[in-house]
Amino acid sequence: MKGPEKAYLVSDKATKMYSLTMDSSEKNNCGKPPLQDDENPHIKYHCHNNNTKAYDARQREQTSAKKKLCIASLICFVFISAEIVGGYIAGSLAVVTDAAHLLVDLSSFFISLGSLWLSSKSSTMRLTFGWYRAEILGALMSIITIWLVTGVLVYLAIERIIRPDYTIDGTVMLITSACALGANVVLALILHQSGHGHSHAGGKHEHMASEYKPQTNASIRAAFIHVIGDLFQSISVLISALIIYFKPEYKIADPICTFIFSIFVLITTVTVLRDLLNILMEGTPRGIHYSDVKQSILAVDGVKSVHSLHLWALTMNQVILSAHIATDILGESKRILKDVTQNVCSSFPFHSVTIQVEPVEEQSPECMFCYEPTQ
């Protein structure tokens, strides 16, 4: 495209359009310092200049997630085979229960890998945001499978408590449960991730909102919840195996441990389920506060008011902002637009920011769409 790039600021009233020419010496939309003329005078300002960094971060996140899931799947398959054989020989419901949950874990790993593949596909005219939410839907499916399998196993545990006509080989159960515990510890270490609220671009530290911490990839987080549930199960099975090994008459410990484990599993899914539903409901992401973002916008010289401020996320870490701002100095709309974008991008981890500048005299206090949202 020849000539300077244009950015258009549209006013709702009379659809008046302001055309602003942006030169190469200006800052880009995510707060990076302006290029000096002697550095690269041919690069024009563009609204997506910093999207390359966001895209690269997303690619690294997905590559890491796929690698972790593939390794976890291989380890999971090996221990599933061992537990099914060991549980069958020992006659232990708890061991077979653990194998069943590992099988569900393996299925969830495959679902997560599929959702990661889908989320990397390009956007279309129908799916303008792309397939990012496939990652969230895949994680939600994993949580639902945990609940379904847990419900079945609770039923079987109750059956064993009511009808205790079964035998358990304590030795085989003890060996198998110890191996299962080791497998789940390894899986938990592989899938565990930690984040911190810094950006290291360009060798500099950019401190984001103090309460915001980058969240784990949804697919990895759901898989980790699966493994933590199995870890609880393995611990409970090992305890029941020790009891049965030394006191065979206390075989009721086997279904009791299965029942106790189920409660722990449901507890471990609550937090991740809440975050997934918040994303699907277009809620404000955890760690980002509406009032803080609004104050960050109002702090820019020339901004008189903010309305239609919306904060939501496509995935755990892809947060989006859109807002309308009013000013009484339209001659500086270009500067105000860039300052607002820079301010929010340097203070919060926004993946995309859309700002509409409007004349302050066109604001309508009676407009139902401009009201401040309730608490």
UniProtKB/Swiss-Prot annotation:
Protein name, as recorded: Proton-coupled zinc antiporter SLC30A8
Lumenal, vesicle side: 90-98, 157-170, 245-251
PANTHER family linked to this entry: CATION EFFLUX PROTEIN/ ZINC TRANSPORTER, PROTON-COUPLED ZINC ANTIPORTER SLC30A8
Residues spanned by motif HCH Motif: 46-48
SUPFAM superfamilies for the chain: Cation efflux protein cytoplasmic domain-like, Cation efflux protein transmembrane domain-like
Entry keyword Ion transport: yes
Species assigned in the record: Xenopus laevis
Amino-acid positions noted as binding Zn(2+) 1 in the UniProt annotation, renumbered to this chain: H101, D105, H226, D230
Highest taxon above the source species: Eukaryota
Organism taxonomic ancestry: Eukaryota, Metazoa, Chordata, Craniata, Vertebrata
